[in-house]
Amino acid sequence: MSAVLKDPIPAPGRPESTRPEPRPGVLAIEAYVPGKSHAPGVEKVFKLSSNETPLGPSEKAVAAFAEAGRKLEDYPDGSATVLRQAIATAYGLDPARIICGAGSDEILNLVAHTYVGPGDEVIFSEHGFLVYKIATLASGGTPVVARERDLTADVDAILALVTPRTRLVFLANPNNPTGTYLPFDEVRRLHAGLPANVLLVLDAAYAEYVRRNDYETGLELALTADNVLMSRTFSKIHGLAALRIGWAVGPAHVIDAMNRVRGPFNMNTPALLAGAAAIADAAHVEKAVAHNARWLPWLTEQIEGLGLKVTPSVANFLLIHFPDTPGRTAKEADAFLMKRGLVLRQVASYGLPHALRMTVGTEEANHLVVAALADFMSGNSSAGQEAGGKDK
């Protein structure tokens, strides 16, 4: 007996369409735009737009990556066993409390997909990482933005926004793109003020760079509380951004729930092995910390000496503020620097249209940026068209 074909009936609440349509809300999401990598027409480019380490990855990680390339026909370990064990060894953790993902971006998206749905609310600070909003909307939730104080997360402002619909609070500590941080007493106060059914997600992507006595990553809180997850990344100090490696630690019930949503082979073998080698190379990490400790204050002092404001940073980048004056704006500065092969990050999408974010670079790049900004602020646009090119 042949089947009877019927005209399709539009889903309730959706208009008839002649093509597949995404579910409501998807097209309202502003796609993430990464930092630029190129400067058109410039011979030598210094990418200072994405907060990557200027020292590159550990040689041990590079060797592990190369070795992994000898056996690409096999599926990766879906449980990321070798990487979770390496992380556990480095931090004295139970590997069962660790989940790994393709960058901390995947971790943040996983936690949103696991705990957030239509009608739920997610709180984050007004200049917080853009992925928080994207992950919330992609899960069908409602973003709730807390005002900051002096470009720093405000615990009281966050707690004032908590409602019975709140499911998650994202806190970047240190924060990107401002470089500011909350002392851990404030983080504890935030946690103490949250209902037990609200998950606090501490995004500590830049934790290794912080050298402040009142700072903690949140690791201990993630191990002892039932509603705290701490996420980390290999993209910054470990120099493995191209491999997309992130991880998180938290309560067993949270990790179990996230693993049920996680894809079965969400990380590739080269990433797993390179990440395991990188986290075991403490000497390489210390070199990166020392480089940043040398150049972050130097850049801050030099740039402030040009009459520009720099938000005090504890990370591996600076937020540079420009006047809203024709010829001196952040957008014009970005174009000026780009012509010299110096690629910084515009942060208007973060609600900071008058600022640029600069990664701490190599010694050469740092000096070139300061020299270029000096020319820009003085109106000397003809001095050296390229940072390292033929026109200099």
Swiss-Prot record:
Pathway entry: Amino-acid biosynthesis; L-histidine biosynthesis; L-histidine from 5-phospho-alpha-D-ribose 1-diphosphate: step 7/9
Keyword tRNA-binding part of the UniProt annotation: no
Family in the record: Belongs to the class-II pyridoxal-phosphate-dependent aminotransferase family. Histidinol-phosphate aminotransferase subfamily.
The protein, known as: Histidinol-phosphate aminotransferase
EC number: 2.6.1.9
One GO-annotated biological process of the protein: L-histidine biosynthetic process
Catalytically driven reaction(s): L-histidinol phosphate + 2-oxoglutarate = 3-(imidazol-4-yl)-2-oxopropyl phosphate + L-glutamate
Pfam families, A to Z: Aminotran_1_2
Coiled-coil residue windows: none
Entry's Gene Ontology molecular function annotations: histidinol-phosphate transaminase activity; pyridoxal phosphate binding
Upper lineage: Bacteria, Pseudomonadati, Pseudomonadota, Alphaproteobacteria, Hyphomicrobiales
Keywords: Amino-acid biosynthesis, Aminotransferase, Histidine biosynthesis, Pyridoxal phosphate, Transferase
Modified residue annotations for N6-(pyridoxal phosphate)lysine: 236
Subunit structure: Homodimer.
Residue span of region Disordered: 1-24
Cofactor: pyridoxal 5'-phosphate
